[in-house]
Amino acid sequence: MFRPQIQKTRVLVLIAIFNLLMVYFAVNSKVKVYQVGYDHKIEASSIMEKTIKSYKSLIDYEISKNDLFSSGLVGVKTSLITTKEEVEGLDLLSSKIACTHPNFAAAIVEMFYEMDIKESDIIAVSMTGSLPGANIALLSACKAMNVKPVIISSGGSSSWGANRPEYSWPKIESLLYENNIIDYKSVAYAIGGGNDL
């Protein structure tokens, strides 16, 4: 009876041995390639994680169930200092949550590299009370890369940001700075909101 060459046991064994050799070489020849700024990204993420942990030890309010990463940086839907309330079709909460993850600091480091910001550079920064997580991520990236920010911040916040009157962004920033958790503080503050120029 006729058997095609590929079905012969000898050929199948040779193919199996060849495949095993290829798998062995593939597994043992892998090389880890790190992106530019990898060490700064890891450091910034670690700094942000420690900053959030320290901040949580200083606050006296219950962390919202909406705060998926339990950062303590997600505010309330509306308050006396809310500059823009969430309306149907405008999801402000997800953006507030996203920037509270420590990996957001690594994303800021990536942006620094894209903008060719280097160690010892001085940068101008405008912070908003609407995104306290992004503010802390930026400060963490600055610390990791030894970049000095000159900061102007807004005191108000949109829904879910630093909009608790007793924990507005200026108060959070002062609390972190006075407890030596962050190295930089705003040089000026604006009220915030739509008419803030």
Language-model features: where?
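N-terminal, Lys/Arg-enriched amphipathic/low-complexity engagement segments
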Residues: 43-101
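Hydrophobic membrane-insertion alpha-helices, especially the h-region
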Residues: 10-28
